[in-house]
């Protein structure tokens, strides 16, 4: 084993660990950094205490532990053990623990000093998983505040040294060049006219015909693996084994894919990107890389995750190609044009930038950090995702201000997804706890194919679910209890209230309580049910509606009875346009879904009035009784605000009046419950109520409703919003006046509409003096003949005004 590439840098690495709290190691997959180096570190006297080795994937963790134990001629659980979500294999003599990501976070939270631990190794850090970034942030905090003697080794196949060195400028960097054989990299774009599965199968079969050795085929997801496997089966010989490899497979099935092919056989391993770096797959000489991957993208707007298929980064293509050169010179066929490969992103985007951060936020709050920016990150968590995480934790009752509530502390202690943790801590007795634990186990590892009915899955007794539920019950300190299907709905509803769904139409479409759309296949048996709880959703790429992956049909009346806290009751009084009156309803709602609507017999006077006000807002002010007097008062107030701005006039534009209906109109609405009643309201008096006595006097003085002309006649002034005020008066009543009268403290002259004895306009003037001296002559000449009994003097500016004819003058 000393011939492994990493052995060449062992001395340098040990010296670095002796001198520095953090060390960076860059070594390709297969260099021995996971399956040999930890044992050398275990024997190093400079490491005081246990070693914790973090492996991001369960299969890798178990394989690494198995391999390390074999090198010691032991079984896992002796010197070397492992811990993962549903499996623990450690003993009293265990000094090296291989753990998965969530397990390491739990260890740090339960014992922040990591008592008895001398070294933590973060393996495959280049994958930049969310949990690895969190673990690094927590460990750096531990080193800074609690354990300056704790050592941290960050290992990676393609270490992003520049970023890490900026973050850890004092950390030594140790580089192992590794050992690999030349790999011929070929490029072949897939035909546009051919289905992806068929084209990949054809290219893979052709590679097998032309070349010897076993082959590793990279595909984006499980669906493609299964379809390509089916296509390949008819294109290969009997000496070729087809071995799928992806995370959801059982550990035994995964091991079949990584072990060497039997003597005289070849194998094709059809894998997701799980096989890029974290696993050593025996016997591979050929690689076919479809150059695609499926990644999860969280949408903070909807709170859902979308799976997208995208081109892999150049770093991933290099890693995939490298798999062909571990044993001998190999060949990698990238199913993409070389020009496209060269335009691909250099590195993959870190999970922390595109993930649901509710679990991370809960972990940070449990750690005592309410501001994530206080921690050390390679990439800061996006603010918008943190806000979405905070909203979810608030909905689950996990927050009290900026800290965890008592319930939130219980949730965080479990180490589960926040929704599942909320469901688990809500259990009030052993049976509820057993039921919640089984639901959580199913939702953590949902069935891959087939029935989308959660109730059907719950009825099965799969060993993995049973094992996980027992582990969760142990965390809850529950020893007994029976899982009961009748308890599923109320338990789910507490954690997934926003995902209660009601059918809309007959084509499998539903609306969620949060307002989003969701859909089932129209042929799915669940689509016959009006109400569902859909805890497992996936945001579609082709449709705005989410896809329901797993759901439970519910009796909504029973659910409301058992979970009354879900329901918001609102009494609504609405305007009935057809009748011109009000109608009252009581609505029971879960989020935006209406559960039940029933007539309300006796709504309160306040509710009736509020409904009337709402109706006015909906229809606008025209439904009110705007008499000429009321309209003129409103115009006077609008003009007063422009002409006398130094006074505090009320705003009476449409928007302001609608916004203040409760102030000026409501006091006059006693007993008004219909459109007819509205039409009877005195709007003039209601508007006058906006002014105190002093302002009423000022308005009547400065912008009067009427003007008294020299003859004593009291004539209404016509106010306009965009034109000057006007006074329509018979010409004879303005004799003796040299200028136009003014209002608003003399600032605004009245436009005079001078009328004939028959009340018809003769002249409109803004300059009475100029009119008497000029155009009046033409008017005089014409009017003398038409109205000889009326006075038409030669000098009107100096003639006494009159309302009479000559006979009475």
Language-model features: locations:
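P-loop NTPase motor module signature
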Residues: 1-423, 483, 538, 722
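Conserved helicase core region in the C-terminal RecA-like lobe
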Residues: 102-103, 270-274, 291, 506-524
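Short, isolated positions in well-ordered beta-strands
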Residues: 181, 518, 714-716
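Charge-dense polyanion-binding interfaces
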Residues: 121-122, 250, 254, 426-447, ...
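C-terminal accessory/binding modules appended to enzymatic or scaffolding proteins
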Residues: 686-748
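Extended active-site and interfacial segments that coordinate phosphate-rich ligands
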Residues: 111-126, 136, 290-294, 303, ...
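Acidic, serine/threonine- and proline-rich low-complexity intrinsically disordered segments
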Residues: 399, 432-517, 530-706, 745-809
């Amino acid at each position: 084993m000393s011939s492994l590439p990493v052995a060449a840098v062992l001395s340098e690495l040990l010296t670095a660990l002796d001198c520095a709290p953090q060390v960076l190691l860059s070594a390709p997959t297969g260099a021995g950094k996971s399956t040999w180096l930890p044992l050398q570190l275990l024997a190093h006297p400079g490491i005081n205490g246990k070693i914790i080795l973090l492996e991001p994937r369960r299969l890798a963790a178990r394989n690494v532990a198995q391999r390390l134990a074999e090198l010691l001629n032991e079984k896992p659980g002796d010197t070397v053990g492992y811990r993962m979500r549903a499996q623990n294999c450690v003993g009293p003599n265990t000094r090296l623990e291989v753990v998965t990501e969530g397990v390491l976070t739990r260890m740090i939270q339960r014992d922040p000093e990591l008592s008895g631990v001398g070294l933590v190794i973060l393996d495959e850090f280049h994958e930049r998983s969310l949990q690895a970034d969190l673990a690094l942030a927590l460990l750096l905090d531990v080193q800074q505040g609690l354990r300056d003697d704790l050592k941290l080794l960050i290992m990676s196949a393609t270490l992003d040294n520049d970023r890490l060195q900026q973050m850890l400028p004092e950390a030594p960097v140790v580089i192992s060049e590794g050992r690999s054989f030349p790999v011929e990299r070929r490029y072949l774009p897939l035909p546009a006219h051919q289905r992806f599965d068929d084209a990949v199968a054809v290219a893979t079969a052709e590679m097998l015909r032309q070349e010897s050795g076993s082959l590793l085929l990279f595909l984006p997801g499980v669906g493609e693996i299964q379809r390509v496997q089916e296509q390949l089966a008819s294109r290969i010989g009997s000496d070729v084994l087809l071995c799928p490899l992806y995370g959801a497979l059982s550990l035994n099935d995964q091991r079949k894919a990584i072990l060497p092919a039997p003597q005289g056989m070849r194998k094709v391993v059809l894998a997701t990107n799980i096989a890029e770096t974290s696993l050593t797959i025996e016997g591979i000489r050929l690689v076919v890389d479809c150059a695609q991957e499926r990644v999860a993208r969280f949408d903070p707007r909807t709170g859902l995750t979308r799976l997208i298929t995208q081109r892999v980064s150049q770093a991933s293509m290099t890693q995939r190609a490298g798999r062909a050169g571990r044993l001998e010179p190999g060949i990698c066929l990238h199913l993409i044009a070389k020009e496209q490969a060269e335009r691909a992103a250099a590195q993959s985007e870190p999970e922390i930038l595109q993930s649901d951060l509710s679990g991370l936020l809960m972990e940070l709050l449990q750690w005592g950090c309410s501001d994530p920016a206080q921690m050390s990150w390679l990439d800061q968590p996006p603010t918008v995702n943190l806000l979405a995480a905070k909203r979810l934790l608030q909905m689950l009752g996990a927050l009290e201000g900026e800290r965890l509530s008592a319930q939130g502390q219980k949730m965080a202690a479990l180490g589960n997804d926040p929704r599942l943790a909320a469901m688990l801590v809500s259990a009030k007795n052993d049976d509820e706890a057993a039921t919640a634990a089984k639901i959580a186990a199913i939702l953590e590892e949902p069935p891959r194919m087939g029935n989308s009915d959660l109730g059907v899955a719950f009825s099965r007794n799969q060993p993995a679910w049973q094992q996980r539920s027992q582990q969760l019950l142990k965390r809850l300190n529950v020893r007994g209890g029976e899982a009961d299907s009748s308890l599923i709905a109320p338990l789910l509803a507490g954690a997934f209230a926003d995902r209660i769904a009601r059918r809309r139409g007959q084509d499998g479409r539903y609306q969620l309580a949060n307002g989003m759309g969701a859909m089932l296949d129209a042929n799915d048996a669940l689509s016959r049910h009006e109400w569902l709880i859909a805890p497992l959703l996936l945001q579609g790429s082709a449709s705005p509606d989410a896809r329901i992956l797993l759901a439970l049909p519910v009796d909504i009346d029973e659910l409301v009875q058992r979970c009354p806290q879900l329901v918001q009751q609102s009494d609504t009084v609405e305007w009935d346009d057809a009748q011109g009156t009000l109608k009252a309803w009581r609505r029971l709602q879960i989020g935006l879904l209406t559960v039940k609507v029933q007539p309300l017999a006796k709504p309160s006077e306040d509710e009736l009035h509020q409904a009337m006000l709402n109706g006015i807002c909906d229809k606008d002010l025209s439904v009110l009784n705007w008499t000429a007097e009321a309209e003129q008062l409103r115009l006077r107030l609008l003009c007063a605000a422009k002409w006398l701005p130094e006074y505090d006039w009320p705003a009476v534009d449409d928007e302001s009046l609608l916004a203040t209906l409760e102030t000026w109109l409501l006091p006059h609405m006693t007993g008004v419950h219909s459109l007819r009643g509205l039409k009877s309201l005195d709007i003039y008096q209601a508007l006058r109520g906006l002014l105190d006595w002093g302002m009423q006097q000022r308005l009547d003085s400065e912008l009067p409703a009427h003007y008294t002309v020299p003859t004593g006649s009291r004539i209404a002034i016509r106010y306009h919003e965009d034109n000057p005020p006007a006074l329509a008066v018979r010409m004879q009543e303005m004799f003796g006046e040299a200028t136009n009268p003014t209002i608003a403290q003399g600032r605004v002259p009245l436009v005079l509409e001078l009328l004939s004895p028959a009340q018809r306009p003769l002249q409109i003037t803004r300059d009475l003096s100029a009119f008497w001296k000029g155009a009046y002559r033409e008017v005089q000449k014409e009017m003398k003949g038409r109205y000889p009994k009326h006075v038409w003097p030669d000098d009107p500016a100096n003639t006494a005004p009159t309302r009479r004819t000559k006979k009475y003058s």
